[in-house]
Structures are given as C-alpha cells and as structure tokens.
Amino acid sequence: MSRYRGPRVKIIRRLGVLPGLTNKIPQLKSSSINQSTSNKKISQYRIRLEEKQKLRFHYGITERQLLNYVRIARKAKGSTGEVLLQLLEMRLDNIIFRLGMAPTIPGARQLVNHRHIGVNDCIVNIPSYRCKPQDFITIKNQQKSEAIISKNIEFYQKFKRPNHLTYSSLEKKGLVNRILDRESTGLKINELLVVEYYSRQA
C-alpha cells in the first residue's frame, strides 16, 4: 500500500488529531451523530485497525514500512510497542518535525528529499534514516534552506519541544540527546493494539 496523499482533514475527522499529518484540528461532530455512533458496537478488530492507521498517517509511512518496523521491534529487547514507537520517532523526518524545523512530517520529508538537511554535517536525503543519540541535525548552508527552516522554528516557539531533543537558534542546529521515553511521544496512541493487530503477520 502506497503512502497516503489524499485530503488530510478527512483522515483526522475519522481518527482524531494527528499532528504529524496536519496541524489542523478536526471539527467536532454533532451530538446526534455522536449518539448514534456510541450506540453501535465497535469490533475489537476495528479498534486495532484504527490505532494502526493512526501510526501510519501520523508518521506518513506505508503499510509495508510499518509492518517491517513491527518485525524489528519484536526482535528487540523490551516492550515491543515501546520499541516500535522509538523506531518511528527516531526517523529523520520525524526528528526534523519534532525539532520544529518543519510544520508537519510531510513537510519535513520534503526538506530531506530536497537536500536541505544534514546529519553530523553530512547531507542526508533519506527521510527514513534512523537517527541516534548525539546526532546533530544541521541546515544546509544556503540562504533558501535557512529562510524556510527559520520561519518554521519561529512559529514552533509556542510549542513545547520534547526533552530528548534540543535546538540552538544561534547555531541553527538540533541535537538528539537520547532515545525518547514513552511520555514524550507526540501522539495519543495505544501502541499495544497495533502490535496485536500485526500479531499474525509479524
């Protein structure tokens, strides 16, 4: 299944707030619609499916990519769900987004694809590149690159940056301090339901 490129508002109306996909807030449904929905019995499969879809759309990855991340997480030590979130959060496109260098993950991916971003002073054009603790995220030394990212950083100042990341406005450089903890994930998600969804595939 390919990466979703359709209307983003349609997705957040169904799944709720997904800051990685869009910074728009879904409009609340009318009380009559909510009442009719609450009277319907929602299957466990649908609940797991929707949690899985939240991860896919928030991080902007394909079905195959998510399945591969689940398989890697299963082989790692620790909680499979927590490791899965760490793998997704340490993607370069997500790090750029969480640093505030881009308004969304698709926007961050575009910066990477257009070679605006460096890791440890080397240009990286792979959005799925897995960052590590003590990695420096830098802006390509071009006026256009700096103007785009500085504008995003200025807008992001009103939001709280997660503790595992720091950004120096003076040096125009981000730093991955450590692997994030569960509470720092910027998404309301039950990752265990995602693991259960893939239990027969991974």
Swiss-Prot record:
Q: Which GO terms describe its molecular function?
A: rRNA binding; structural constituent of ribosome
Pfam families annotated for this entry?
Answer: Ribosomal_S4, S4
> Chief location of this protein?
plastid
One Gene Ontology term, aspect cellular component = chloroplast
Q: Which keywords annotate this record?
A: Chloroplast, Plastid, Ribonucleoprotein, Ribosomal protein, RNA-binding, rRNA-binding
What are the BP-aspect GO terms? Answer: ribosomal small subunit biogenesis; translation
Whether Lipoprotein counts among this entry's keywords is no
Kindly list the residue ranges recorded as spanning the membrane. Answer: none
S4 RNA-binding domain ranges (all copies): 90-153
Q: Which family does it belong to?
A: Belongs to the universal ribosomal protein uS4 family.
Instruction: Give the multimer and partner information.
Output: Part of the 30S ribosomal subunit. Contacts protein S5. The interaction surface between S4 and S5 is involved in control of translational fidelity.
Instruction: Kindly provide the name given to this protein in its UniProt entry.
Output: Small ribosomal subunit protein uS4c
Which organism was this protein described from?
A: Hookeria lucens (Moss)
